[in-house]
Amino acid sequence: MGKITFYEDRGFQGRCYECSSDCPNLQPYFSRCNSIRVDSGCWMLYERPNYQGHQYFLRRGDYPDYQQWLGFSDSIRSCRLIPQHSGTFRMRIYERDDFRGQMSEITDDCLSLQDRFHLNEIHSLNVLDGCWVLYEMPSYRGRQYLLRPGEYRRYLDWGAMNAKVGSLRRVMDFY
């Protein structure tokens, strides 16, 4: 079970809304989001309703302003609680669409795909175990995308506008 609290103003001030499960539309509860407290669980936040737009991965902790979660604005319109996974993590990445081209298997965090696999683009992937966050740039920076178990035949399937990938991280709650 997870718990996240959204605040309209910075520094955990103003109107707030507490959430403990997936919510496809947060608009009825607050007009803007400038700070967040994650009491438990790992969450993916989305700038638009129905899990659309920029995504932001948050784990337990305090985020006193939207720059702390690498947000582009104070717009958070939907959220998803990421289920905890206690087993192994496994993903296969491919250099071309539809699982074609060279395949590499990943079982742990990857700070730089370029350094480790000599890749800066992934065109398809298959998440076999666990949930992952894909980052557009190395060192877990840039746009973020939640990858749940399943097949992603092209980068559009995970919500990206291009195949650029810099790093990958397993979703784990370390607290």
Swiss-Prot record:
The entry's keywords: Eye lens protein, Repeat
Gene Ontology molecular function: structural constituent of eye lens
Keyword Repeat: yes
SMART domains for this protein: XTALbg (SM00247)
InterPro entries found in the cross-reference section: Beta/Gamma-Crystallin (IPR050252), Beta/gamma_crystallin (IPR001064), G_crystallin-like (IPR011024)
Domain characteristics, as noted in the entry: Has a two-domain beta-structure, folded into four very similar Greek key motifs.
Assembly behavior: Monomer.
Functional note: Crystallins are the dominant structural components of the vertebrate eye lens.
Similarity remark: Belongs to the beta/gamma-crystallin family.
PANTHER family per record: BETA/GAMMA CRYSTALLIN, GAMMA-CRYSTALLIN B
Protein name per the record: Gamma-crystallin B
Organism: Canis lupus familiaris
Phylogenetic lineage: Eukaryota, Metazoa, Chordata, Craniata, Vertebrata
